[in-house]
A protein has these predicted regions:
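Beta->alpha loop/short-helix hinge microenvironment recognizer with preference
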Residues: 1-314
Length: 314
């Protein structure tokens, strides 16, 4: 995953424009968890769609940015204790293309008021969720079977509308490339890495978790083995589901043309590719200073190139 992450970050850095970048997190209320768990592909896809539409529609409003930004979205479904916690990380450029194909950049911090963002997102998600319900395109597990009843559904929807779906604006980046480096931490993550696992016994698994508040020390979480496996498997995405998606001027269909125009308007590209065209051995050496052709024990050249692989020098 580390190599894939390096390559992904390198590719995205070359797409960074000269503007501030913002990290926005949209989180779904836990009351939706039973419905989410039995409609994963459909409702995760709906989350991607609603986050993107919310950001794009508000950004295009002249009161806020009046332009189409670039957006990278990454879906996560867990928290530090591996509980079901569905949320979307979005990196949003503070600049974009206007309808007359000019560049406009935000001069503020985050350019959309949080309350406006919250209301738009909540309204969109619940309206589209209600459409799926009316079209009978939702599945119901025993834990949410009661929602088949239209009166129960209306009551459920009213409760969701009354909740505060407040998005979180986590970071503002003025160093350009560091926004992508930051998001790179999220793109190739899985629910838990080996480095967090402290011990495994016949009956329990112990692992570290961040403190519940900023500045709190790390804590140890211990779960029965079966519960650890259950929680881990909750975060396996449906086959073929794309957890990383691109919108705005980064949408795949028009990305090359949009970036070419933006770089022309801004006087050049901010960053160049670091690892383009490198073999795996060259990338490992450039990124981590690790030369796989040299024996780590004695320092001698132990391997020689043999096409795309290496052979032992005998």
């Amino acid at each position: 995953q580390a190599v894939n992450q390096k390559i992904w970050v390198d590719n995205r850095r070359a797409e960074v424009i000269d503007s501030p970048y913002f990290h926005v997190i949209f989180t779904l209320p836990h009351e939706l968890n039973p419905l989410l768990s039995c409609n994963q592909g459909r409702l995760y896809g709906l989350l991607h769609k609603c986050c993107a539409q919310t950001l794009l529609e508000l950004s295009s409003n002249p009161r806020y940015l009046g332009a189409v930004p670039g957006i990278i979205q990454v879906l996560h479904t867990w928290n530090q204790e591996l509980n079901y916690h569905v949320h979307m990380h979005c990196i949003v450029s503070g600049g974009g293309l206007t309808p007359d194909r000019k560049i406009r950049t935000s001069q503020k911090n985050f350019f959309i008021p949080v309350a406006v963002l919250r209301d738009k997102f909540r309204g969109k998600y619940l309206a589209m969720l209600d459409s799926l319900y009316r079209e009978k395109r939702l599945a119901f597990s025993p834990s949410c079977e009661a929602l088949r009843n239209p009166y129960e559904w209306q009551d459920f929807k009213n409760r969701l509308y009354s909740m505060d779906w407040c998005p979180y604006i986590k970071e503002t980046f003025h160093g350009f490339g560091n926004a992508i480096e930051y998001l790179g931490r999220y793109t190739h993550k899985i629910a838990i890495s080996n480095s967090r696992i402290l011990s495994v016994t016949d009956t329990e698994v112990s692992f570290t978790a961040r403190g519940r508040k900023t500045g709190d020390p790390k804590r140890t979480v211990t779960l029965p083995k079966t519960e650890f496996i259950r929680r881990y498997l909750m975060h396996v995405l449906p086959r073929g589901f794309q957890k990383v998606r691109y919108y705005g001027f980064l949408n795949n269909r028009m990305k090359s043309a949009n970036l070419m125009l933006i770089f022309k308007l801004q006087g050049g590209q901010r960053f160049r590719y670091r690892y383009a065209g490198m073999s795996m051995a060259e990338l490992l050496k450039a990124a981590w200073g690790f030369d796989i052709s040299v024996c780590p024990a004695c320092g001698c050249a132990a391997l020689k190139p043999a096409g795309r692989t290496y052979a032992l020098l005998l």
